[in-house]
Structure formats: C-alpha cells, structure tokens
Amino acid sequence: MNFEVCKQLVAYARSIEKEKGKNFRFTLTTNGIGITDEVIEWANKECYNVVLSLDGRKEVNDRFRKDIAGRGSYDRIVPKFQQLVKARGGKGYYMRGTFTHYNTDFTNDLFHMADDLGFDELSMEPVVSKAGSPEALTEADLPILFDQYELLAKDMLRREKAGHPITFYHYMIDLAHGPCIYKRISGCGSGTEYMAVTPWGDLYPCHQFVGDPDYKLGDIWNGVTNTELRDEFKLCNVYARPDCKDCWARLYCAGGCAANALHATGDIHGVYEYGCEVFRKRIECALMIKVAESLDPELAGRAATAAPATDEDCGDCSSCE
C-alpha cells in the first residue's frame, strides 16, 4: 500500500471540493498486509467505504493470497480487518472475496466470515481465468454455483427473520428507485468516467487493463491522448451488444464487464456468457428475497427500514433535475 500517495491524493481532493462544487467520496481497497493503526484512523475519517480482500476460510484464502515469501496471509490480515471494522463504528465496508473451481462451495466461506469472524457486509465474485487454468470455473460447476446462490438467499432470509441479517452485495436490488437509465446501460463507465492510474502515472480504462499497451489512454501529465480508444469505450454499453437484446437482466448488468468480455471474446463489446449465467442467477435470487420479504409482514417491515437510498442524485447529468 502506497499510503503516502493515498493521503496526499485525498488531501488534494478535499482542498478543491468547494472550489469545484464537488463532494468527493473515497473507497480504500486493501489486502490487509499494510494496515496499521494510522491507516485505520485515516480510512475511518476519510473513506466513504473500505473493501477488505479475504477469500474466506484459511485454506481457501491462503491458496492464492500469499506474501512475497510465499506464506499465506490469513492469520495476519484477519485481526487487522476485525480491528478496522470495529473502529469504523457502522460506516460502510465490504469483505470482498473471489471463489474459484477449488471452492465452488463458496457459501461456506461467506458463512465463515459471518459466523466465525463477525463480518456482516459481504461480497464474493467468481474468478475470471483463462479456460483450462486449474482455478477456472467450468460448465460443470454452474449447477453447483446456482445451488449455492439459492442456499445463500434462503439463509439470508433465515438470518433476517432471526434478527441477525447479513448483506450480500450482489443481492442488493432496489425495485422502487435505482439508478437513472444512463447508469443502467453504461455500468461502471470504464474508460470514460472511470480510469486506473498506475504508480508511473499512466491511465487505463480500469485496473484490469493495466500493462496492456493497446489499452493505454494517456498519462496524468498529458491527459487522455488516445481519444479513439476513449470513444470506443463510450459506445461500450448494453445496447451495443446484440447478444444482450433479449436478456431480461440487461438493465441490471448494463452489458457486463468490458475487461471480462475482452478476456473471454477478444472484444470489449463481446459478451462473457459464463458471467451472464452467474449474473442472472444472482438477480433471480435477489428478486426471490424481495418477494419473500413482501409476503412476510415481519420481513417486509424490516426490509422497508433497511432499504438503501439509491435514488440519490449522482450529479453526472441533468436527467434527474
């Protein structure tokens, strides 16, 4: 973690907020190795959210999350994560993991984080790897993953009814409000509204493109110089993908991840079909939870109380005025 750069960046943004008429919100993502008391104090003061990388059970996490000496990180990072979350005093955070072919029973990793470690804001993403890689998810894994998502949804309802709810990022869905149509079709806005900055000052559409010279947008000294690439990303939306035309979930995924599409199809306008299958299942389960809550008076009351305020004006366009 380049903590000095983090501090300087946030301090600079704060110094120009009033002048620019902006409200900057920062999220710190960390694997936990570099967390200190100073980092915790700073993050809890300056960061709207923190994302803490943990793949779940010790043996699962330590399979891939190792330090430079090849040692697993679990035993060192978990106490730091617990300290940070406790110090946040209710401010936003997410435990963010990745599941692979090695742990298609990923609900056990989520339940471990919730029941054994005390975390209740959870996220777990499927790995995106080259086909044939040992960790890559396979077609045979899909039915298992679907069962896991259903198991998770049912367990979340059980926990909610017992008064000990957990949040799963991918089941958060607001059917009453939600984002404007621009956000619904353009997703994360990689390459236009969203960029990755390398330690050397280079600009890329997002962190997954870093190091690929074909996807370098420019640098912090000269700005965006590859305007042709930027314009290509401007057109990277759900309506630019013919395969999305008849998908019922298209306005929830906005066409999916450009980087995943590139890695799967060789084209940022392509469709990563495996990811589509997983995404549709997650939305299906999110809808199932909403229906179950609406049919249970006790759950309906709690759901209304906990409903996220997603209709906040993002300030990106005039359509909300």
Q: At which residue positions do the language-model features occur?
A:
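Radical SAM/AdoMet-radical enzyme domain recognition
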Residues: 2-127
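Short, small/polar residue-rich loop motifs at catalytic or cofactor-binding pockets
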Residues: 188-191
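Short, flexible cytosolic linker that couples an ABC transmembrane/permease module to its adjacent nucleotide-binding
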Residues: 179-185
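Radical SAM enzyme core and accessory elements
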Residues: 200-202, 239-321
